[in-house]
Every structure is written in C-alpha cells, then in structure tokens.
C-alpha cells in the first residue's frame, strides 16, 4: 500500500542516513524534483545546475558524457553548487557487473564516483554481489554517507525490467537496509510490512510531452506520485526545446510538491 506519511515522518524512522538527509532536505526546500542534466560540456552542466538549483532536491548526472570532464573543473564546482543551493548529487551510473568490478568502477578510474556522488544506482542482473561491492567501495573511499538505488523498473518502451526481474531485484535490495535506500521504479515497491521504507524515484515524468522517437514514455506528475513515487526525475522537460530552466524548474517543483501534499492529505 502506498504510504501517506510525510517525508519528515519517514526521515525520523529510516535506517539509511542518505534517506534521512534527503527527506529532511526535501521538506526544507518543499521540493521532490530531481533534475536530470544530460549535457555534453562542463560549462552547460554547471550553468544549468546553477539555474535549477533553487528548485531541486537532487541533480542527476551521467558524468561519462561530459566531453571536457576533469575532477577539478567539473566536480569541485558542482559540489560547491550543491552547498550553495542545498541539493544532493545522484550519479546515474547503472552499475551491472560482479562485485569486485563495480567496486573499482565506483571508486577509481577518471570519475571516482564514490568520492562525490551522494547516491548512485545498479542493476540486479548480477546478483547481490553488486550491492556488497559498491558498499565496500564507499566505505573504503569516504566517511560521507552513500546510498544505492536498485533499478527495478524502467520508463523506456520494451524494457525487460518488470515482473520476475523486478521481484528478484527487490530481494537483492532486502539484503542491505542501510546502503540500499530504494529503487528507480514506476510504482510503489512494497516492503513496508517487512519494515522497509524505500525511496521511489521515477524517470519519464512530463507535464507536456508524451514521449520521444527513441522509446521514452512520459507519465504525469500526479499519476506517478499517487502510485508511490517520492522523487520525480525530469530532464528535457526542464530545459529541452528551448525551455527556460528557471520557469520550468518552478513549474515542476510546484506540481511535484502539490501532488505529494494531496497524497499525504488522503491518508489523514
């Protein structure tokens, strides 16, 4: 059953330090909006994030598409913006290998994701070792709390992530209550009867477009929030097709928060 508890109530009882921090921040900013900023240059990334920062609780990156990436010029300014605007950082890496490999992918290489991303995500296809590997990597890299989202369902047409696959992914999530904070999913994932209170983040949310020619399918803000989504992930709806990110940031922030208030009120 979809929870009607407020983010503040849930932050008080969560075993995940990242969830607690995120829910507290969401209440403080009155925002459940995550900006997906898929651009190709550091300048574009930082400019967009600075404009959207006041309206979001999270920024979602695909850091490996930045053509001119460097830790000093890309990540350090991004971290400064996260402090300035009070948002968290989610690197959408979608890890999908054995535990030892993902540990090195998470901590090493050019990107050193574990050093700067508050949360990341992983597929369940390789089993629970992916969770163990990423958790070890986080613990060995930083004293800062880190969180993991499992990819239970996707928003793209023809996705294989549903049914039995989703159920198995939920089983993997249950192996670590502190590090695994929730799911990328299209619906409520259950677990409350076993003491889990997972954060559900949903991509493919739009107020205008219904999809694109590459298989993306959009659902409305009210629809996803009513079905259990806690954080709406919006990308091109904020800045694509010449849209003004400030105008759209305000618009999506308001729509997401109002939908959340409706859900909470329904349970009172």
Swiss-Prot record:
GO terms for cellular component: cytosol. It catalyses: orotidine 5'-phosphate + H(+) = UMP + CO2. SUPFAM superfamilies: Ribulose-phoshate binding barrel. Pathway: Pyrimidine metabolism; UMP biosynthesis via de novo pathway; UMP from orotate: step 2/2. Its EC number is 4.1.1.23. CDD domains: OMP_decarboxylase_like (cd04725). The keyword Lyase applies. Pfam families: OMPdecase. The active site is at residue 94. It is an enzyme of class 4 (lyase). Substrate binds at residues 38, 60-62, 92-101, 218, 236. GO terms for biological process: 'de novo' pyrimidine nucleobase biosynthetic process; 'de novo' UMP biosynthetic process. PROSITE patterns: OMPDECASE. Keywords: Decarboxylase, Lyase, Pyrimidine biosynthesis. It comes from the Eukaryota. GO terms for molecular function: orotidine-5'-phosphate decarboxylase activity. Belongs to the OMP decarboxylase family. This is Orotidine 5'-phosphate decarboxylase.
């Amino acid at each position: 059953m979809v929870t009607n508890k407020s983010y503040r109530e849930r932050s008080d009882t969560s075993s995940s330090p990242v969830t607690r921090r995120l829910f507290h921040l969401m209440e403080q900013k009155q925002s459940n909006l995550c900006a997906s900023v898929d651009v190709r240059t550091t300048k574009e990334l930082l400019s967009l994030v600075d404009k959207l920062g006041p309206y979001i609780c999270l920024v979602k990156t695909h850091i490996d598409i930045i053509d001119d990436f460097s830790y000093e010029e890309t990540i350090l300014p991004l971290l400064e913006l996260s402090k300035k605007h009070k948002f968290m950082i989610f690197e959408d890496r979608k890890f999908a290998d054995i535990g030892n490999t993902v540990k090195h992918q998470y901590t090493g290489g050019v990107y050193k994701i574990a050093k700067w991303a508050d949360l990341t995500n992983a597929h369940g296809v390789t089993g629970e070792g992916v969770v163990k590997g990423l958790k070890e990597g986080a613990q060995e890299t930083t004293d800062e709390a880190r969180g993991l989202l499992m990819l239970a369902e996707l928003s793209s047409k023809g996705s294989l992530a549903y049914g039995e696959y989703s159920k198995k992914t939920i089983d993997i999530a249950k192996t670590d209550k502190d590090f695994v904070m929730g799911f990328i999913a299209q619906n409520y994932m259950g677990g409350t009867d076993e003491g889990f209170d997972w954060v559900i983040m949903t991509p493919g949310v739009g107020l205008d477009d219904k999809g694109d020619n590459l298989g993306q399918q959009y659902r409305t803000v009210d629809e996803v929030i009513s079905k259990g989504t806690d954080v709406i992930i919006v990308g091109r709806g904020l800045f694509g097709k010449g849209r003004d990110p400030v105008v759209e940031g305000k618009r999506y922030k308001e729509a997401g928060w109002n939908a959340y208030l409706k859900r909470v009120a329904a349970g009172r």
